[in-house]
Amino acid sequence: MANLEKKRVVVTGLGAITPIGNTLQDYWQGLMEGRNGIGPITRFDASDQACRFGGEVKDFDATQFLDRKEAKRMDRFCHFAVCASQQAINDAKLVINELNADEIGVLIGTGIGGLKVLEDQQTILLDKGPSRCSPFMIPMMIANMASGLTAINLGAKGPNNCTVTACAAGSNAIGDAFRLVQNGYAKAMICGGTEAAITPLSYAGFASARALSFRNDDPLHASRPFDKDRDGFVMGEGSGILILEELESALARGAKIYGEMVGYAMTCDAYHITAPVPDGRGATRAIAWALKDSGLKPEMVSYINAHGTSTPANDVTETRAIKQALGNHAYNIAVSSTKSMTGHLLGGSGGIEAVATVMAIAEDKVPPTINLENPDPECDLDYVPGQSRALIVDVALSNSFGFGGHNVTLAFKKYQ
């Protein structure tokens, strides 16, 4: 039941399946090393595609957490979500049982959902007829199954939902889960984002929209946020999951606490289906409102995990928004884009980037922006170029923006 007294919300578990590592430890180590997860596409024949590279998850085995029969009935985006959620639950040492199952929920966002199964079943429909289509096609395809299957796998019977807000979906899921715990609707939420959109149709569509990088001769340097020579984003895949828990619950069971979530805001540009409003006013409001929600002042911010897609429009617009929201203090903080290493996971990006943001607070280190070799004069902040950095991180923000004009900012701080 809802409680009028707002609860403090802490992060007690993290899980990550990414192009640079399939566990939290490997992912964080990869970020600290500046590991590059981009390479030629191996999941399908991309020889006729305008873009032929991406950030694939490597050496991933869904049967580590799922039996083979279950795994066959799930799309890859659900594999990532269910397995990353199991990692996070294990990390939190949170036992779900008959006594607490109703108080633990799931909220996982995705921008697209099961696109691969849709493509495969469309081919079967055209080649063999409707009677040969799989009875599992619909539950494998629909976006909410990442949350649904995670709940089934873990036995979590509390609030359950799915956000589908393009590239802001993972961050919206975390923010909405934060509100549920903060307002007493759940003791803990398993939340984040997932995506598996490295497919022929996805690449064809994003390439036609001129959103992707076409640097086929040099994929390792294609994702270059805030660099003058950037030419589009690089597709990635994977999932990042957080366990958000009521502080009293976490303390009662002696849980490890990575940090505290303190603010969330979302706005809309109401401007264009794909392009951000050039003056960045929508993103500016999201950043400012998240700080207001948290009760923190701009000068308290140490680090921002930027949306930083490596597209010509986003990086300049986001830089403007950060400066407009934080004033002159924007020049005193570290801002980095981990998409330079992982590529852009679309709806999954908010999940893995929130994980990185929380780890920056816990470890007092910030990830770099790799491939930033020729800075854009309009992008004039400290983007932590090239190498990770030791930095006392007391307050950190994570930005996510999506097609449709969605803007989301999450605010975290050290637990004290």
Curated annotation (Swiss-Prot):
| Keywords, ordered alphabetically | Acyltransferase, Fatty acid biosynthesis, Fatty acid metabolism, Lipid biosynthesis, Lipid metabolism, Transferase
User: Which enzyme class?
Assistant: transferase
Which pathway, per its entry? Lipid metabolism; fatty acid biosynthesis
* Superkingdom: Bacteria
Enumerate the SUPFAM superfamilies for this protein.
Thiolase-like
Q: Which reaction does it catalyse?
A: a fatty acyl-[ACP] + malonyl-[ACP] + H(+) = a 3-oxoacyl-[ACP] + holo-[ACP] + CO2; (9Z)-hexadecenoyl-[ACP] + malonyl-[ACP] + H(+) = 3-oxo-(11Z)-octadecenoyl-[ACP] + holo-[ACP] + CO2
Domain Ketosynthase family 3 (KS3), first and last residues per copy: 6-414
Cross-referenced SMART domains: PKS_KS
What Enzyme Commission number(s) appear in the record? Answer: 2.3.1.179
Q: What protein family is recorded?
A: Belongs to the thiolase-like superfamily. Beta-ketoacyl-ACP synthases family.
Query: NCBIfam families attached here?
Result: fabF, PRK06333.1, PRK07314.1
- Protein purpose: Involved in the type II fatty acid elongation cycle. Catalyzes the elongation of a wide range of acyl-ACP by the addition of two carbons from malonyl-ACP to an acyl acceptor. Can efficiently catalyze the conversion of palmitoleoyl-ACP (cis-hexadec-9-enoyl-ACP) to cis-vaccenoyl-ACP (cis-octadec-11-enoyl-ACP), an essential step in the thermal regulation of fatty acid composition.
**What is the name of this protein?**
3-oxoacyl-[acyl-carrier-protein] synthase 2
